[in-house]
């Protein structure tokens, strides 16, 4: 029970299970794992796919002949295991050239380098069968406002994304581009901070239909926002192209904790939302094992992410099927035809009728919504004492 299978569409990045445990205050505590070994290990655990940055697979500066050998060896592992590569992304944050931005660098040569690196990563992803290209603007931010750069960066990023979308069309790549917001880190402030800001920006692009979102649990939580609401907004806009699942304590650095390890109630309602919405994309765990762990702990972390998701899925489905929950929700969502007749699309007649209508406000002011009981039922399902 709760055993992951490929049909659950769970994915991990090479950088997640491959995280060596380095942090700003300490060196690596684990050896780098061979990407081919990671592919075989994830397949053993029941994962659907593996995602990657360009440099996770091909170290920066690798000669072309060696690059081709690496790709052939990696593709062989994919063929042997059946694992997919649903998503790729370019590392536009590690190279010192990107210290003041990649697409938003004030130096046009750096912007050109970032764009070329992105095109090459798109080529790599196409070789591996990827259909989603994530753009994380981690270095696209500032600590100093004296430059006035905040007035210029939108044009630079728009230019780069429009170029990438046109390149994808010209090459016959079927990419959907998923933009990943984050409020800060590594920059003091990142220009594309939240799901809402990314949604607004997408509509300024030449091909907005090719662009959507890759929201991350930790990133919205860092800003003190409600991730379930952010994902619901992305779903409503038809823009949830990909999702990063992890966990996070509010107002901390980006912790990338094991999914469900901190905000269990939020994780419960996130799984409830994803599973009830018809979302068909990957469930990607952008997290990593604690620095305390050896390799065995890394795979315990990976198993834990998937197992927690499946437990929450089962608990959420049972919660929604509970007769008392259904009864409470039926009472919560009132469908009074007289009130509904005053709502909906505008007409002059409806506006006049609305102004004339006698609204039962006294009764509505006294109404109770039974949310305490409904929420308690959710808690009891989470605690495993009901259903």
Curated annotation (Swiss-Prot):
PROSITE patterns: XYLOSE_ISOMERASE (PS51415). Mg(2+) 2 binds at residues 216, 219, 254, 256. Its EC number is 5.3.1.5. The active site is at 53, 56. GO terms for molecular function: magnesium ion binding; xylose isomerase activity. One of its GO terms (cellular component) is cytoplasm. It holds the Pfam family AP_endonuc_2. The keyword Magnesium applies. Mg(2+) 1 binds at residues 180, 216, 244, 286. It is found in: Cytoplasm. It catalyses: alpha-D-xylose = alpha-D-xylulofuranose. Binds 2 magnesium ions per subunit. Homotetramer. This is Xylose isomerase. It comes from Thermus thermophilus (strain ATCC 27634 / DSM 579 / HB8).
């Amino acid at each position: 029970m709760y055993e992951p299978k490929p049909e659950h569409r769970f994915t991990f990045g090479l950088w997640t299970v491959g995280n060596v445990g380095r942090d700003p205050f300490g060196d690596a505590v684990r050896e780098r794992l061979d990407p081919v070994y990671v592919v075989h290990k994830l397949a053993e655990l029941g994962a659907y796919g593996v995602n990657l940055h360009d440099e996770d697979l091909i170290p920066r500066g690798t000669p072309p002949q060696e690059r081709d050998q690496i790709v052939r060896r990696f593709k062989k592992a994919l063929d042997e295991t059946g694992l997919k590569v649903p998503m790729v992304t370019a590392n536009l944050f590690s190279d010192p050239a990107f210290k003041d931005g990649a697409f938003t660098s004030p130096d046009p040569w750096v912007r050109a380098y970032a764009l070329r690196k992105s095109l090459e990563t798109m080529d790599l992803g196409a070789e591996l069968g990827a259909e989603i290209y994530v753009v994380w603007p981690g270095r696209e931010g500032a600590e100093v406002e004296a430059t006035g750069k905040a007035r210029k960066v939108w044009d630079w990023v728009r230019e780069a994304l429009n170029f990438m979308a046109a390149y994808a069309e010209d090459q016959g790549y079927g990419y959907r581009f998923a933009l990943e917001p984050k409020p800060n880190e590594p920059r003091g402030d990142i220009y594309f901070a939240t799901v809402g800001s990314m949604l607004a920006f997408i509509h300024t692009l030449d091909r907005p239909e090719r662009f959507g979102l890759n929201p991350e649990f930790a990133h919205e939580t860092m800003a003190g926002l409600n991730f379930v609401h952010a994902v619901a907004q992305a779903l409503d806009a038809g823009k949830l192209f990909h999702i990063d699942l992890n966990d996070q304590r509010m107002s901390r650095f980006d912790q990338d904790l094991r999914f469900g390890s901190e905000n269990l109630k939020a994780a419960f309602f996130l799984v409830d939302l994803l599973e009830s919405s018809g979302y068909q994309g990957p469930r990607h765990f952008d997290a990593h094992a604690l620095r305390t762990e050896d390799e065995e702990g890394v795979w315990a972390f990976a198993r834990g992410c998937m197992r927690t998701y499946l437990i929450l899925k089962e608990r959420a489905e049972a919660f929604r099927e509970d007769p008392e929950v259904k009864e409470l929700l039926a009472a919560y969502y009132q469908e009074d035809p007289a009130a509904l007749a005053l709502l909906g699309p505008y007409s002059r007649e409806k506006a006049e009728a609305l102004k004339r209508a006698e609204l039962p406000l006294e009764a509505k002011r006294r109404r109770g919504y039974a949310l305490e009981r409904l929420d308690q039922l959710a808690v009891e399902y989470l605690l495993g004492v009901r259903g």
